[in-house]
Amino acid sequence: MGRSLKKGPFVDGHLMKKVEAQANDEKKKVIKTWSRRSTIFPSFIGYTIAVYDGRKHVPVYIQEDMVGHKLGEFAPTRTYKGHAADDKKTRR
């Protein structure tokens, strides 16, 4: 179930402050965050936000088509290495 429209999109306050401070600065730095639950706003476009995936910060460059999605969608938490291969020679 999605979020109610009357509430509006959610973004953590500390993340919004970092993005606004970055807008006033000439030099663009990577913004580190642990807030995977924050919605991407149009004001985030053009910034690189490093989203924590449980062991490291994954850099995510925000583009126009990402607006409205959550930051956590672009930093996968699980690594899938595939199933074990069947070694039929050892079974004989």
From Swiss-Prot:
Keywords assigned by UniProt, alphabetized: Ribonucleoprotein, Ribosomal protein, RNA-binding, rRNA-binding
Keyword Lipid biosynthesis: no
GO MF assignments: rRNA binding; structural constituent of ribosome
Coiled coil: none
One GO process term, biological-process aspect: translation
GO CC terms: cytoplasm; small ribosomal subunit
A matching Pfam family: Ribosomal_S19
Cystine connections: none
NCBIfam families, per database record: rpsS_bact
Function: Protein S19 forms a complex with S13 that binds strongly to the 16S ribosomal RNA.
Similarity comment: Belongs to the universal ribosomal protein uS19 family.
Protein name: Small ribosomal subunit protein uS19
Gene designation per UniProt: rpsS
